[in-house]
């Protein structure tokens, strides 16, 4: 289900970044550069939410809020304010603002507020947590809930697509820090020369293009939890700096001389065997032991047969809502195919299969052919290859030692991460060459401007501060 949002922001770069975020979230929007320009748009179109900056030339966000409250009393308004102006934002909520965001903020924080105020959805519900009907999954979830109550560092291992970030978010939600930020940063998706400034922040003038100081992800997560996703992809040089942050619980921005104290909980994920990476010299041994205080191994989907259908039903509900479909159900034969499939791509592959089936199904009942599990769309469908069901695990809690990854997993995972990182680097380099001009950059890349906007939104969703590091050396 999509919201229709009116975005009011005078800063062009930020307006484009917010537009990209709304686009990635699947929402409709109209973006204007002033409160004065917003008024005629409001008069001719219906919106489910207004997102407005506070400090703008001419009519500011507070004045716009007052007019909207008078003319459109049921239209929620979300205000964006600078770090030092929180008091005024709180006062605006007393005057009728639905909520506020303090800059800089994560894309997920914006999308959560859009879902809450425009669509009436509460983020972090049961529909977002781990599915654990398999006995081994339930036991692992119990361990996760127990360690959540402490501040211990947790290392979550598992194949790509198993839902490691979902488990990490569950640990955060079960912890005393649940009401504080949860910041996830994908170490595999960000080019090496941008990762340090993304994690630790930078001061004004610390490199070419650093026109203003920016806090890093560690600072943004202060008081809450930071997730270092795919930590095994972090360069060795940066691993030493991360080790110091974990030991001292303080961070130094790039170009700064004074450290900043942190109150933070650290979680990390990996799809590799970190012990083997240490032995091969690709990962620091001291950092490995600092991270693996409490290791958890999230099993691949093929070893969690009891979780497959509940996951499929959840994904069916989720994507049915997004596609504005009526009631759609899994047919018994389709359900059997799902349980028998090997799922080399894990939950991510299951998600894709459900989306395909919703597009292809007719009459509200998904059949095996709609899933396209064993052949590309348009090719004859072969019978699914059955996999042997694993034996029932013992009643005692499972070991939390990190298992070796499945054969072939490292190569495919590393290849995918490397290709994504190279793609992002090519996009950044092309934008530098074109001095930030998106239309020209898209032409040089051979893609449409809309595709470029989507790629930039993906980069921001992976934790990259595109604007801040566009001209970084």
From Swiss-Prot:
List of residues that carry 4-aspartylphosphate: 53
InterPro entries according to UniProt: AAA+_ATPase (IPR003593), CheY-like_superfamily (IPR011006), Homeodomain-like_sf (IPR009057), HTH_Fis (IPR002197), P-loop_NTPase (IPR027417), Sig_transdc_resp-reg_receiver (IPR001789), Sigma_54_int (IPR002078), Sigma_54_int_dom_ATP-bd_1 (IPR025662)
Chain residues that bind ATP: 158-165, 221-230
Nucleotide-binding found in the keyword field: yes
Domain (Sigma-54 factor interaction): residue spans on this chain: 130-359
One GO CC term on file: protein-DNA complex
Function recorded in the entry: Member of the two-component regulatory system FleS/FleR that regulates the expression of multiple genes involved in flagellar synthesis, adhesion, swarming, motility and antibiotic resistance. May function as a transcriptional activator by direct binding to a cis-acting sequence upstream of the target genes.
Protein name as it appears in the record: Response regulator protein FleR
Gene, per the UniProt record: fleR
């Amino acid at each position: 289900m999509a919201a229709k949002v009116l975005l009011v922001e005078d800063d062009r770069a930020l307006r484009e970044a917010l537009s990209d975020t709304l686009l990635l979230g699947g929402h409709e929007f109209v973006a204007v550069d002033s409160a004065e320009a917003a008024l005629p748009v409001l008069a001719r179109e219906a919106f489910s939410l207004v997102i407005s900056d506070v400090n703008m030339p001419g009519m500011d966000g507070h004045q716009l809020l007052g007019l909207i409250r008078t003319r459109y009393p049921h239209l929620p308004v979300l205000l964006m304010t600078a770090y030092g102006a929180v008091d005024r934002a709180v006062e605006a909520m007393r005057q009728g603002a639905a909520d506020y965001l303090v800059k800089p903020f994560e894309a997920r924080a914006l999308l959560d507020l859009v879902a809450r105020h425009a669509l009436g959805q509460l983020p972090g519900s049961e529909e977002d947590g781990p599915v654990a009907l398999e006995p081994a999954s339930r036991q692992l979830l119990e361990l996760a809930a127990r360690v959540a109550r402490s501040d211990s560092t947790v290392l979550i291992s598992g194949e790509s697509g198993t839902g490691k970030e979902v488990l990490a978010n569950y640990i955060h939600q079960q912890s005393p820090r649940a009401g504080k930020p949860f910041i996830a940063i994908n170490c595999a998706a960000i080019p090496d020369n941008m990762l340090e400034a993304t994690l630790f922040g930078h001061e004004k003038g610390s490199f070419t293009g650093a026109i203003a100081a920016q806090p890093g992800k560690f600072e943004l997560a202060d008081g809450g939890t930071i997730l270092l996703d795919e930590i095994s992809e972090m360069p060795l040089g940066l691993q030493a700096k991360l080790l110091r942050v974990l030991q001292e619980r303080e961070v130094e921005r790039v170009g700064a001389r004074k450290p900043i104290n942190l109150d933070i909980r650290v979680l990390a994920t990996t799809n590799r065997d970190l012990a083997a990476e240490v032995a091969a010299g690709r990962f620091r041994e001291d950092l490995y032991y600092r991270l693996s205080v409490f290791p958890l191994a999230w099993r691949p989907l093929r070893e969690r047969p009891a979780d497959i259908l509940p996951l499929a039903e959840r994904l069916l509900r989720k994507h049915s809502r997004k596609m504005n479909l009526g009631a759609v159900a899994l047919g018994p034969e389709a359900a059997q195919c799902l349980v028998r499939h090997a799922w080399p791509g894990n939950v991510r592959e299951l998600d894709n299969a459900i989306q395909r089936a919703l597009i292809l199904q007719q009459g509200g009942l998904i059949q095996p052919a709609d899933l396209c599990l064993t052949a590309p769309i348009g090719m004859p469908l072969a019978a699914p290859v059955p996999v042997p069901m694993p034996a029932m695990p013992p009643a005692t809690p499972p070991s939390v030692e990190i298992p070796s990854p499945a054969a072939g997993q490292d190569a495919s995972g590393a290849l995918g991460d490397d290709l994504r990182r190279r793609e992002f680097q090519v996009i950044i380099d092309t934008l530098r060459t074109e001095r930030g001009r998106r239309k020209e950059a898209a032409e040089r890349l051979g893609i449409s401007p809309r595709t470029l906007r989507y790629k930039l939104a993906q980069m921001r969703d992976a934790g990259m501060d595109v604007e801040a590091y566009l001209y970084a050396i």
